[in-house]
Amino acid sequence: MAKLEDFIKAKEKLSKVLLETHLIYSPIFSKESGNKVFIKPENLQKTGSFKIRGAYNKISNLTDAEKKRGVIASSAGNQAQGVAYGAKESGIKAVIVMPKSTPLIKVESTKQYGAEVILHGDVYDDAYKKAKELEEKEGYVFVHPFNDEDVLDGQGTIALEILEELPETDIILVPIGGGGLISGIACAAKILKPEIKIIGVEPEGAASAYEAIKENKVVELKEANTIADGTAVKKIGDLNFEYIKKYVDEIITVSDYELMEAFLLLVEKHKIIAENSGILSVAATKKIKEKNKKVVSVISGGNIDVLMISSMINKGLIRRDRIFNFSVNIPDKPGELAKVVDLIAELGANVVKLEHNQFKNLSRFKDVELQVTVETNGSEHIKNLVQAFEEKGYEIIKIKSKVN
């Protein structure tokens, strides 16, 4: 098990490459959770995630002989950039094996840090096997993304920074993928402040740590199904399992829909864009039982595909009842469509989409179906809108307010 001096040494080494990520107080997540919530924005690191901490600490602890051999890693995202940047800053060779399906932007970002990129296989497991083959064949040093003591020590420096800036922290919420981040943070935090509570957060569709604790052994999930792809890990590290058992107080899960809602609030209220895995801890603030505590949520990364941003925002708006989809039957005669639009306008809602389908068969042959999407101010606004339609004699026949 790691000792305090291991984390302190790691912090000293990392001072050369880290951006100091100060805590950000969140009024919105504080209000919704009944606690004082602070955000630790690791998405602002140079490589876009916390991974540089563990990768650089691992590389800096290599012997001169090992550094001459160079390092190798397998990744489709944050680990690739962390290892590539860490190797560049240390002046050594880095080879990163990535699946062929890796988005071009991530491949190019990794290359920009000077790493040699090898595209191999269709999924991460294929890339991992190839990296291990090259480790054996070429003599590279493999940098594991989470199941490694030096990596764990690097990640744990986050806890040192949190407790230095906010010593009265009661709870730290940490995303869990393979388990390296929470292992380091939990160990360091408990050494410094034994009474602190550490809560791990996993996606519902990839809760490998939760299942491991429940079974009291490392288990492999049949599948990992979640939009939080960075934490879609079927099996946590065995080393990390021991740390989690000893230092983590609780593990909770959040749904993809809760992630969408948290994403929207981060963008709208904090102007922060983070990846789905990175916001697990923020999404979990509403699910903790404690009240009136000082809570720190670690945003672990911000490397999100730009094409996903609009989808996350739109689904978050639906989740918050800010977008309302419904269908209503109206008489098929001139002026009826205008009446509906005028009624919506009177109620202060904004039409986003309107589809007037005259050819859909209805039980009442003189009616047509009108499909409407409007922007609203929330649940109460929707309730008023539905009531107003009913008072005018319209029947809303299909309501799709939530995404769950």
Language model: regions and residue ranges:
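PLP-dependent amino-acid enzyme catalytic core
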Residues: 1-404
